[in-house]
């Protein structure tokens, strides 16, 4: 059986770039990933946007961040900021 702490660490994580920080305590993060085309087999680059909770309003546009899945915080927010990997220059 998985303990409570292990279950918390099994949540999904994404790494991406901050696109917007105009909302109060919320950032928009663009996460890139590659997906195989079902017919042709070529890997296609795709981007998905996530709204993430930034408790201290510490992110700026262009920062590379890590976000983690969490309970629903609003209609569109289901992710929270874990760490800022690299600051924008």
Swiss-Prot record:
GO terms for molecular function: rRNA binding; structural constituent of ribosome. It holds the Pfam family Ribosomal_S17. One of its GO terms (cellular component) is cytosolic small ribosomal subunit. PROSITE patterns: RIBOSOMAL_S17 (PS00056). CDD domains: Ribosomal_uS17. Keywords: Ribonucleoprotein, Ribosomal protein, RNA-binding, rRNA-binding. One of its GO terms (biological process) is translation. HAMAP family: Ribosomal_uS17_B (MF_01345_B). Belongs to the universal ribosomal protein uS17 family. Part of the 30S ribosomal subunit. One of the primary rRNA binding proteins, it binds specifically to the 5'-end of 16S ribosomal RNA. PANTHER family: 40S RIBOSOMAL PROTEIN S11 FAMILY MEMBER (PTHR10744), SMALL RIBOSOMAL SUBUNIT PROTEIN US17M (PTHR10744:SF1). This is Small ribosomal subunit protein uS17A. It comes from Bacteroides thetaiotaomicron (strain ATCC 29148 / DSM 2079 / JCM 5827 / CCUG 10774 / NCTC 10582 / VPI-5482 / E50). The gene is rpsQ1.
């Amino acid at each position: 059986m998985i303990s409570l702490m292990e279950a918390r660490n099994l949540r999904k994580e994404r790494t991406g770039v901050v696109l917007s920080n105009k909302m109060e305590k919320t950032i928009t993060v663009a996460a890139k990933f590659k997906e195989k085309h079902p017919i042709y087999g070529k890997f296609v680059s795709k981007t998905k946007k996530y709204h993430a909770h930034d408790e201290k309003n510490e992110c700026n546009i262009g920062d590379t961040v890590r976000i983690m899945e969490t309970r629903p915080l609003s209609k569109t927010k289901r992710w929270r900021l874990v760490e800022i990997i690299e600051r924008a220059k």
